[in-house]
Regions:
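The feature marks the mature, well-folded catalytic cores of soluble enzymes
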Residues: 26-358
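N-terminal export signals
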Residues: 7-24
Length: 358
């Protein structure tokens, strides 16, 4: 099975230009927020070498996500050549399968992060290194470059090492990140937080970076922000809120610290942030310790939101209702993704959007 991504190591708009809808100089790049129109979504097919006996179940989850996203927008799924046929059969004709070598399915982290110019798109290659060398990544380390070459999209090689799941934008000049997944020697040896922040601002055209502490060394990602907090729109942060009966551990402490930071922070427009709590499920049954039970790892698609369902009916209904209120006019679809969750990841972790130009 893939290494657990949550509990254990074992198992861009620029604020100075004004508010929403403001004109941007032609020579500036920005990272659009996820709710902006997509050209398509990229995904990747899990390999048996990484997932072992869990492979079939994880592939069912990935195929289910791909088919669902394809109801809203085009999907391109990367697969090793020998497995492309199986991927096509599982995902159906609405999903394009392309033979690009991969190690694992976490396209949010291995794929390029797309930024916009006035009339073009470019891809930031964040130099994926297996979450700091914790997992074999010979193929995944080349995925971003391969995608951009195949699509004939300009590649921007980052001067830092990071993963897409470590970064969250409001599309209006603000970035939200966990320090634990960026300021560490397994990714950026010898680099200070200030140096990394300068690189992030340049890469994504942001002017404000909000840092929360995160958790170092307890999961393979060192606690990505997309399992903790998301922007639903400029000025609104959706936070994965532990239930009252949750144990006092490093994860609840990380939430408490992040909540204090977000409550005090201002965005690139100089405005305070509103926090919307998205409570985690109370009952997750017999799932393992590394199971990722958070609803904020949803994915916003054209006209919809694809989010997890965990089987705690009260919590599932409440989460869907909150997300509908956050994204009015979008269809909310909940999917069971238990096999993916046992690997410590979720729907957002397995997808990567390419923004529409124009």
């Amino acid at each position: 099975m893939g290494i657990s991504r949550r509990r254990t190591l074992q198992a861009a708009a620029v604020a100075a230009l004004g508010g929403v809808g403001c004109a941007r100089p032609a020579d500036r790049r920005w990272w659009p927020d996820e709710s902006q129109r997509h050209e398509l979504t990229y995904m990747a097919w899990p390999t048996r070498r990484i997932w072992g006996s869990a492979t079939d179940g994880v592939r069912e989850d990935i195929a289910r996500i791909a088919r669902t996203v394809a109801d809203f927008e085009p999907v391109t799924l990367l697969a090793n050549r020998a497995e492309a046929g199986a991927a096509r059969r599982a995902c159906g004709s609405a999903v394009e399968v392309v033979p690009i070598p991969v190690d694992d399915l976490w396209m949010r982290d291995t794929g390029p992060t797309f930024v916009r110019g006035a009339d073009h798109v470019a891809g930031v290659d964040l130099n994926f290194n297996g979450w700091g060398g914790k997992q074999e990544h010979a193929r995944d380390g080349r995925v971003a470059r391969a995608v951009l070459k195949g699509e004939r999209v300009r590649r921007i090689k980052a001067p830092i090492t990071a993963e897409g799941g470590a970064l969250e934008t409001d599309g209006e000049g603000t970035l939200l990140v966990t320090e634990s997944s960026l300021v560490n020697d397994s990714r950026n040896p010898g680099m200070s937080r200030n140096a990394i922040e300068r690189a992030l601002k340049d890469l994504f055209g942001v002017t404000t970076v909000i840092w929360v502490k995160g958790v170092l060394g307890e999961d393979i990602t060192d606690y990505h922000i997309d399992a903790l907090a998301r922007f639903s729109e400029p000025g609104v942060v959706v936070m994965s809120t532990p239930p009252e009966q949750a144990p006092r551990d490093v994860w609840t402490a990380a939430y408490d610290q992040a909540r204090k930071v977000v409550d005090r922070a201002v965005d690139a427009r100089g405005k305070r942030l509103e926090v919307v709590e998205l409570p985690e499920p109370v009952d997750i049954g017999r799932r393992g310790e590394g199971f990722l039970a958070c609803y904020v790892n949803y994915y916003v698609v054209n006209g919809g939101v694809v989010m997890p369902r965990f089987g705690d009916r009260k919590a599932d209904r409440r989460a869907a209702s909150i997300v509908r209120d956050l994204y009015p006019g979008r269809e909310v679809v909940q999917l069971p993704v238990d096999h993916l969750g046992e690997g410590g990841g979720g729907i957002h972790c397995s997808t990567q959007q390419r923004p529409e130009v124009g």
